[in-house]
Amino acid sequence: MWRNASMNHSKRNDANDFDSMDEWLRQFFEDPFAWYDETLPIDLYETSQQYIIEADLTFLQPTQVTVTLSGCEFILTVKSSGQTFEKQMMLPFYFNDKNIQVECENQILTVAVNKETEDGSSFSLQFPLS
C-alpha cells in the first residue's frame, strides 16, 4: 500500500506564528514604505511632484551618518563606538536621472527626489552629513 510520508507526522499548529504574520501584513498594508526600528526609523512617501525619504536621527550626531544614493538604492550608514550600522532600502525609482535635494533639520534627514526626469547618466553619490 502506498502512503504519503507526511501523513505520518502531525502538523504543528502554532497560533503565535499566524498572529505574528497577520500583524506584519497589517502593518505592511497600512504603511508599506515605513521601515521602523527603534534605532533608525525611516519613512518613504510621495507627493504629486516628489518622492521624499525621511530618517529620524534624534539619537545620532550628524558626524556619525553617511548617506549613499546609488541606482535605486538608499543606504544610511551610522558609525558609532567602533561599530557600523547600515540600513538599506531598494526604491521604486532610480536616482540617476533625478534632481535631488538633501537637508538635515531638527534631527530629521530629508531627501527629496523630483519625479521629473533630468538629462542624466549613471550615478552614485555618497556624502557625510557633517
Curated annotation (Swiss-Prot):
GO terms for molecular function: unfolded protein binding. The keyword Isomerase does not apply. GO terms for biological process: protein complex oligomerization; protein folding; response to heat; response to hydrogen peroxide; response to salt stress; sporulation resulting in formation of a cellular spore. InterPro entries: HSP20-like_chaperone. Keywords: Sporulation. The keyword Cell inner membrane does not apply. This is Spore coat protein M. The lineage of its organism: Bacteria, Bacillati, Bacillota, Bacilli, Bacillales.
